[in-house]
Amino acid sequence: ELELISGNDKDFRMLKVYIQSETYPHMEGWSRFGLILRQLGRVKQAIDIFRIVLQEETDKNTKGWLYCQIGACKADQSKYEEAIEFFEKSIQIGERHPSNLEGLATTYGNIAVIYDHFDDNDKALLYHEKVLKIQKQLLPHNDPNLALVYNNIGKAYLGLNEYAKALRYH
C-alpha cells in the first residue's frame, strides 16, 4: 500500500537522490518507479504503474517500451501467454516506428526466451534470428551480445536435432 508524503521529507529526499543515482538514471518519473517496483519483486504494482503511464502516453516508441515492460512483468509472474500478447503489441509499434531497433531486438529476445522455456524451438529460433538480424546492424562483429545470440540460435537448432546447424552457431 502506497502512502502520500510531503516532498519536503528529509528521508524521502535522501531516498530520491539515492534512487536517481543508483537505479535507472536514464529514466524519469513513473516509468522509473515501475522499473524499481519490478526490481523489488512488486510486479503487480509495477504493472499497475506501467498501465497508468500507458494511458497517458502519446509517444509511440514509449508506448512500445511500456508494452514490453508489462510483458516482462507478466513473464515474471509466469503468465507467459499474456506476456507474449504484450510483447507482440510492443513489436507492432516497433516495426511501424523502427527508430528504436535495440528495443525491438529486446522484445524479440523476450519472446524467444519464453519459447525456449517451453522447448518450442521452431518459434524460439524464429525470434532469435530476428534478434540476430537487428544486432548485426547495431553491434560490432566481436560484441559479446552477438555471441549470446549465436549461442541461443545454436541451442534452438540443438533442440530441433539439427546438430550440424547447431555446431555452426556454437
List each model region and its residues:
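Conserved alpha-helical positions within TPR/SEL1-like repeat arrays
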Residues: 31-39, 62-76, 102-117, 144-159
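Short, charge-rich amphipathic alpha-helical segments embedded
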Residues: 48, 52-69, 99
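Short coil/turn linker motifs that delimit alpha-helical repeat modules in TPR/alpha-solenoid proteins
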Residues: 22, 58-59, 97-100, 139-142
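Long, contiguous interaction/recruitment modules in multidomain scaffold/adaptor proteins
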Residues: 1-29, 37-45, 55-57
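Amphipathic alpha-helical segments of tetratricopeptide repeats
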Residues: 52-55, 89-99, 132-137
